[in-house]
């Protein structure tokens, strides 16, 4: 066991290929909706595989490491960082003493992590986290860090969420490689869906309870945002936008909490593809594999009734399916 500033880390290797089901676990329908008017929707059959039956309380933040060919992801409420081999199903875990909202590889090796009230660096797998940047949420016990992504300049954009839903005081921040932390904008409840276009000139963001994804022009060099605009508005009662990723064609993929699916939106914000999943609460999508054409989706298994759990026995698992367009290779954190 490693200890650091009151934080304990248990490192163990758990090859879990024995819990991996047959590859043809599920064959949900993928609905492809035409961009223009005229013509009917066509449907293809895709295979969604249960990659890892983790039973996570709140699986989140999948990030592919190309050098390692491993998927990093977290169970926020389980206080666990996972490193999963999608080929063998083997899974390694680091167990922390506080929640971890998101994780990303670093350019020099190791990880950057957003903990409950501050960010930290992990120099190598199993090493103790060391603080990096100010503990900006230390005096805000109703908040914790949540979703994040790294831009092309190696900066981590990370937002918070608040448990006080009546007062939207959560904030999106930008962590620079030198450890400085800047406030980007506030007035949020649950910061989610952070992603960048292929050229780095458009930033996407969702405040989950609003059912809205917004797009912002961004200066890739300075990280300065322009005014935001509505990119896509989801109807009430059919899922809310959670974590996201962008593919090589500039399409934005969003996991819909309470929506049983992930969707693909064109650069114009039009719904062009829906992938149905066997879980109610998919949380985030990432692309990986040797050709970047495997989509990985984390999910949540918390707060389900017995009846709901019976209908989705693999809630909290990590799922995978193949895509026709490769995902973007995300930059690593430069700090």
Predicted features by range, described:
Residues 65-66, 71-76, 112-117, 156-166, ...:
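Conserved beta-strand positions in repeat-built beta-propeller and related beta-rich domains
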Residues 80-82, 118, 170-173, 212-214, ...:
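A short loop-to-beta-strand structural motif that recurs across blades of beta-propeller domains
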Residues 125, 216-223, 323-327:
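Short loop/turn segments immediately following beta-strands, especially the blade-tip
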